[in-house]
Structures are given as structure tokens and as C-alpha cells.
């Protein structure tokens, strides 16, 4: 009997050893990976789209994707949702915050952080674990369809605004996904276009923002983009994802692919892609085949599984979050309104603003039907949209009822017409609304009965297609005619005209900017845009936004402007130019794009070449004035410490954005930009006569330029000039400092061009 009991005990111990299964926690990830079968690993690293069987109906419609659960090991699914200005769901209402462009125009990290916190809070309410944002590609060209979603033409402004957004979201225990890495700067043929650029340009312009946000904020994930980079898909580039991102930048999180299955699966994993989204059964099968034939090593698959598990244990889903599906929309709306005011840019003001509540005539369909945000992954199903008309009424203006009735009826009709018009093809969201023709007689009559006129001009864009020069950058003849007639009649009556630019990116202004008395760039300001616009127009909030990109006089003034599909409209007739398997001879700017301007993107080109622009990078007016004094810059160890005192010299309370620009000696380089932004900040609200000293600390390493031949960063020895002031062309104060000896910093040799850019 004793022998039988002993045998049973031994069998129990053996079985326990064989069949014991670890349950995932923060401390046993290697053990869990070891316990996973090859099939489970192959399923695990391939994402699931929310409408795929057997998951259809389990997740909220519009969910971006989920991960594969393994219940026996305690591994849950986690949820990923768009987007950068609020959670994108098909049916559930969430807050539409201001777009990335407006956020960057605030030149204020706290604004980006508040928006991030708001999106993080709503993520918890809606059961989201990772928000697929921020989008932070450089505004290489004014016509990129997703410029509204991104931040700036400058990598420092982009990187630090992104970092603050990431800090805000992740402070709520929700992950982020910095995207799209890297050199993903056009929507035309976005799945297969080859971005061709030298490594100096890649490092100084197109990956610098990612470097800064990784080193300062460590996003939980980075999203690898669709495009080729110098002949290799970014998702298959080990040099990019492992060499640059992990080894050089120190990224510790997970690399997720942008949503496509048309890549070489083992190459993606070998390169450093950890989670393949949106996922398909064929990818899982390909992984298992690759393990068998040796094209994929188990150690690389284990690395991907490890990174995904490291992400999962941080998520709300793993920690037992119970989503309410009832976000605090009122609290978020307050944040949306307040942050929107911070990034609106006053471009012109000849005594028209601030305006007191009065009788007002509002022209332009977007005065009554405001564009809150763009299309695609950044579209948000918000509970409402406050138009400029509603915002001005809320502020006490009495609107011209004949115009209001005419425009609201037209807006309702055209919205319904566009909704069912098969010719309108947008990824998700709204469509551009054509302007209504208003007779000169009606305009003249309104000038007699109103005290001020507002004309709203709107432009929308979105994912999957770029803007067109003649249709989007230039205003149409009927729009200009409307503005001309309104200005003529109202000026004849001794009354002011204010233009509101409800726009997704730069537009041509030089041909008409002399007509109105004031121009306020409101961008795409989110659901509370109308109230925020009224706050700025009335002086309740003093405008403090500054342009995060240059507004050129002419589209072709920018170097490299012709190396972009500025007049390409996708249709069946030109599909052979887009898809690689159907290409005859690859078409320039569609199959590939030469970044021929090199590092001279935006203000770096215009300032270095003293080329005139409509409005320079960093430009923006205020209802008050500021003075600068006590500029000082010193090198202390590994950092440059700069400070300047800003004083409100005007009669109204206001905030001042301040850029810290540097002109560097050439060192071993034949050319460098005349100025480059290295840091920025914003004062608190200063009362008249009040001062504040802003201090910046910049690593000496951030003064460096990238030497492609030697694959290293070089900070030159010698005398540097520092400039203070947001406007890149108009410094308010300056100081000099010296770097006593040259300093070099090695970097991975990676992503070198295979074909020279033209």
C-alpha cells in the first residue's frame, strides 16, 4: 500500500512538472515565452483586425486591431485604436481634440500634454490599450494629405511636441505609437513609394524627431511605415529598426507595422518588427514555414514575443481595466476648447481685432459647417461640432439672419449630397464642400446692416491621398471673388473684414492677403473650434500661436517642390504607375521620390537663401507687444545653457512663444543652414509690464551635423551665434558662445542610398 501511495505521489510530481503552465506576470516573461508552442508564437505576433472571425462583434466598431490571446498562459488580447486627435470609433462618440498642426502651433509642451491626457482618459473609458499616435512625420511639402495630423517642418518642434503628447497619454497608463517611421512624407502610392535620400538628410531631418521623443519619453510602441527607404521596405529594414531605432536611439519598446500584409513576413521579424498588423492567417503560416526552412530563427521570433509580452503587462486590459464606455465628454470638451485657442495664429491685424460683440455677417460655407479635423485614421465621431457661427453667437454677436438661413440650408443640402455622391472618395470622414455663390447685391445689403464681416475659407485633407496644387493650395476663383466683393462693399461702408482660415495645411495667401483687415489661421481646431475661435476674436484669449511651418509665396519657391506628386489624381488610368507589379518604367514622385532638397526643408532653405515668403516659420501676431533682454548662452560641460528675459511691453495680457535658434560654424562641412531651431518654450500669461526669464538646456551633441561619409555626428569647434524669438527670420535678441573643441559621436552605418537623388 505504501509503495502504491509513493508511486502515485511520484506520478503527481512528474505530471505537475510536465503540465505546469506559467501565468503571465511582469516577472516571468522569459518563462512564458519558453512555454509557448511554435504555433502559438506564430499566431501571437500576427495581429487581428477587429472584424475578423471569430472576433467580429467582440470589439467596438472602428477598433484598429487586437492581439491574439493565449488564455492557458494568462495572455489576454490588447486593443489598439486610432487616432492622433481623439479615439476613432464608428458609432461611439468621443472627443475631437485640435489637430497636430494646431498643437504644434502652440509652441507649448503643456498643450500637447493636456491633449494626450484627455485622449488617455477616454482610452480607459473605451477599453483601449494603445492609441495609434502621435503621427510625427516632417512636413516636407505643403501638399501632403496628412500634414494636419503631423506637427512641423522642423524635427525639434515635432520631437518635443510629440514627446509631451506621449507623456500625457502614458501618464494615464495607456500606450502610444509614434508613427510613421521613417521618411513617410506623401500619401500618393504610400504602400510602395521609395523615399530616396542621403543619410545626412535622413538623420538630421526625418529621424531626428523620433530620436528626441524616444530619448525623452520612450513611447510604448513605434510604428514602422509603409514606404520603401532607399530601396528597402522600412518594415523589412534591420538597419533602420534595429540599427538606428534600437541601437542608436535606445528604443526599448515594441515595433508594430503599419496595417498591411503585403510584405515578406520573416524579413519583417528579422528586421525588428515585433507585431504584424492588421494581420492575416497567411502571415502565421509563413512564419511556421520560415522556421522550418531556416529563413526565420526562433530567437528572432522569441524576441518579438518578448517585446509584445512586455507591452501587454503594462496595459489596462492586463491590469483589469473595466471600460465604462461613457467618457467624460464635458471635461474633454473644456480641454479641447482651451487648447484650441493656444495654437491659432494671427497672421494679420490692421485694427480689426479684438472685436467687440456686434452685428456680424458671416460668409463662406465653413462659417456654418466648420471642418473640425481631417479624414482617415484621424477622423473622430464627435458628439457635436461648434461652428464659427455658433461660437460667435455664444459670444454675443448678432448674426445676419439672411446669410445664416441661406448658408445653413446650403450646408445641409451639400453635406447630404456629398454623402451619397459616389464620386466623392474619402477614406473615412468628410469631403470638401464647394463654396456657395453669393450675389454682389446681397453682399452690399449686408454691409449696410452689419458692423463687421467674417469670411471663412476652408480646406480638408486626409489619409490615402495628397492635396492637389490647383485645387487645394490655391483658392478657387469663386472663393477669391467672394472675398474681393465682401472687402470692397464693407470697406466702402467703413467696416472691417476678417478672414478665418479653417485649413489643413499651408495655402497661397500672397495674392489676396492685402484685401482683408485681419487674418486668423484657425487650422482644424476640433469639436469646440467655434467657441475657441470666438475666444480669440473677442480677446478673451490673446492669440499666441506661431506657425510650425513656412507659408511660401508660391508653391514652387520651396526647394524640391517639384519632387512631389503635386498634380497627381489617382484613377484606373494611372494605376500602372503606382503598383510595382504593374510598373513599366517607374514614374518619378509616384514609384519613387527624390528628396533632392536634402536638409534644406522649410525655413532651413528660405532663411539660408534669404528667399521671401508669405509668412515665415515661427510667425504670429498678438494683441500686445513683447521685449527681449538679458540674452545669455554658456557651455557647461555637456550642455549649452541659454536664457532670455521676456517682458510684456503692451497693454494687454498675453503669452509669448520663444525659439532658441543656433547658427553653427561649418567645421568639416561645406554647408549648413543659416539657423536651426534647437529648443523652444512659452511664457506664462504675462500682465502688462510683467517679465519672465526662460532658460533652455541643450546637449552639445544636439548642435552636431551628421557626416554621412564617416557615419557620425560632429559638433564643430568654434564660435556659435544664438538667436531668440519664435520667428526664424526676425530674431528679437542674440548672443554668442564658443565650443572649445570638436566633439564626435559615432552612429550605425545604415540606410545608405542605393540610387542617387536627382
Give, region by region, the residue ranges found by the protein language model.
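Glycoside hydrolase catalytic-domain context in secreted enzymes
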Residues: 19-705, 712-729, 750-758
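Short beta-strand elements
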Residues: 731-747
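Bacterial Sec-dependent N-terminal signal peptides
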Residues: 1-23
Amino acid at each position: 500500500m505504501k509503495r502504491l501511495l509513493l508511486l502515485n505521489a511520484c506520478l503527481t510530481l512528474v505530471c505537475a512538472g510536465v503540465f505546469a503552465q506559467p501565468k503571465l506576470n511582469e516577472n516571468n516573461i522569459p518563462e512564458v515565452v519558453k512555454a509557448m508552442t511554435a504555433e502559438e508564437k506564430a499566431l501571437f505576433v500576427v495581429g487581428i483586425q477587429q472584424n475578423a472571425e471569430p472576433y467580429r462583434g467582440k470589439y467596438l466598431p472602428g477598433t484598429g486591431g487586437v492581439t491574439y490571446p493565449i488564455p492557458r498562459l494568462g495572455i489576454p488580447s490588447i486593443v489598439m485604436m486610432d487616432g492622433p486627435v481623439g479615439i476613432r470609433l464608428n458609432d461611439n462618440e468621443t472627443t475631437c481634440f485640435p489637430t497636430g498642426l494646431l498643437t504644434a502651433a502652440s509652441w507649448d509642451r503643456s498643450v500637447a500634454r493636456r491633449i494626450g491626457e484627455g485622449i488617455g482618459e477616454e482610452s480607459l473609458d473605451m477599453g483601449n490599450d494603445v492609441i495609434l499616435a502621435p503621427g510625427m512625420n516632417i512636413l516636407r511639402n505643403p501638399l501632403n494629405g496628412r500634414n494636419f495630423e503631423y506637427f512641423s517642418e522642423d524635427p525639434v518642434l515635432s520631437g518635443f511636441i510629440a514627446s509631451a503628447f506621449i507623456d500625457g497619454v502614458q501618464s494615464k497608463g495607456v500606450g502610444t505609437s509614434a508613427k510613421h517611421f521613417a521618411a513617410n512624407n506623401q500619401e500618393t502610392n504610400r504602400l510602395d513609394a521609395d523615399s530616396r535620400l542621403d543619410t545626412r538628410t535622413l538623420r538630421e531631418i526625418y529621424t531626428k524627431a523620433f530620436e528626441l521623443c524616444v530619448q525623452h519619453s520612450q513611447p510604448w510602441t513605434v510604428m514602422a511605415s509603409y514606404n520603401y527607404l532607399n530601396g528597402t521596405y522600412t518594415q523589412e529594414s534591420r538597419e533602420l529598426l534595429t540599427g538606428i531605432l534600437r541601437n542608436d536611439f535606445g528604443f526599448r519598446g515594441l515595433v508594430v507595422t503599419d496595417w498591411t500584409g503585403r510584405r515578406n513576413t520573416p524579413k519583417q521579424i528579422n528586421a525588428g518588427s515585433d507585431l504584424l498588423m492588421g494581420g492575416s492567417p497567411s502571415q502565421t503560416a509563413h512564419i511556421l514555414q520560415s522556421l522550418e526552412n531556416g529563413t526565420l530563427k526562433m530567437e528572432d521570433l522569441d524576441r518579438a514575443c518578448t517585446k509584445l509580452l512586455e507591452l501587454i503587462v503594462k496595459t489596462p486590459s492586463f491590469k483589469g481595466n473595466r471600460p465604462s464606455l461613457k467618457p467624460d465628454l464635458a471635461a474633454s470638451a473644456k480641454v479641447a476648447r482651451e487648447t484650441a485657442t493656444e495654437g491659432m495664429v494671427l497672421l494679420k491685424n490692421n485694427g480689426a481685432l479684438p472685436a467687440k460683440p456686434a452685428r456680424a455677417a458671416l460668409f463662406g460655407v465653413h462659417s456654418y459647417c466648420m471642418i473640425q479635423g481631417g479624414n482617415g485614421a484621424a477622423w473622430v465621431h464627435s458628439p457635436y461640432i461648434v461652428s464659427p457661427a455658433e461660437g460667435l453667437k455664444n459670444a454675443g454677436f448678432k448674426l445676419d439672419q439672411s446669410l445664416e438661413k441661406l448658408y445653413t440650408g446650403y450646408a445641409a443640402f451639400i453635406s447630404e449630397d456629398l454623402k451619397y455622391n459616389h464620386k466623392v472618395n474619402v477614406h473615412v470622414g468628410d469631403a470638401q464642400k464647394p463654396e456657395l455663390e453669393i450675389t454682389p447685391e446681397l453682399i452690399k445689403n449686408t454691409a449696410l446692416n452689419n458692423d463687421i464681416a467674417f469670411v471663412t475659407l476652408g480646406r480638408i485633407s486626409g489619409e490615402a491621398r495628397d492635396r492637389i496644387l490647383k485645387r487645394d493650395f490655391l483658392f478657387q476663383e469663386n472663393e477669391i471673388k467672394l472675398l474681393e466683393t465682401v472687402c470692397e462693399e464693407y470697406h466702402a461702408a467703413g467696416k472691417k473684414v476678417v478672414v478665418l482660415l479653417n485649413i489643413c495645411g499651408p495655402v497661397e495667401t500672397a495674392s489676396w492677403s492685402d484685401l482683408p483687415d485681419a487674418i486668423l489661421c484657425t487650422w482644424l481646431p476640433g469639436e469646440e473650434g467655434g467657441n475657441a475661435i470666438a475666444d480669440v476674436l473677442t480677446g478673451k484669449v490673446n492669440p499666441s500661436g506661431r506657425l510650425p511651418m513656412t507659408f511660401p509665396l508660391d508653391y514652387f519657391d520651396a526647394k524640391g517642390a517639384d519632387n512631389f506628386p503635386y498634380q497627381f489624381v489617382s484613377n484606373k488610368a494611372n494605376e500602372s504607375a503606382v503598383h510595382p507589379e504593374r510598373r513599366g518604367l517607374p514614374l518619378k514622385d509616384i514609384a519613387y521620390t527624390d528628396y533632392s532638397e536634402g536638409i534644406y526643408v522649410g525655413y532651413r532653405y528660405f532663411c539660408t537663401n534669404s528667399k521671401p515668403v508669405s509668412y515665415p516659420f515661427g510667425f504670429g501676431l498678438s494683441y500686445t507687444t513683447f521685449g527681449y533682454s538679458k540674452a545669455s548662452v554658456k557651455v557647461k560641460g555637456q550642455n549649452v545653457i541659454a536664457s532670455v528675459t521676456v517682458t510684456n511691453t503692451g497693454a494687454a495680457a498675453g503669452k509669448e512663444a520663444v525659439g532658441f535658434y543656433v547658427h553653427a560654424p561649418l567645421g568639416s562641412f561645406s554647408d549648413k543652414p543659416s539657423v536651426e531651431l534647437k529648443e523652444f518654450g512659452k511664457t506664462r500669461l504675462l500682465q502688462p509690464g510683467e517679465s519672465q526669464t526662460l532658460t533652455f538646456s541643450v546637449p552639445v551633441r544636439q548642435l552636431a551635423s551628421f557626416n554621412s561619409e564617416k557615419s557620425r555626428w560632429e559638433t564643430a569647434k568654434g564660435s556659435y551665434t544664438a538667436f531668440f524669438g519664435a520667428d526664424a527670420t526676425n530674431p528679437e535678441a542674440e548672443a554668442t558662445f564658443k565650443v572649445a573643441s570638436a566633439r564626435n559621436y559615432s552612429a550605425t552605418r545604415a540606410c545608405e542610398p542605393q540610387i542617387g537623388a536627382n
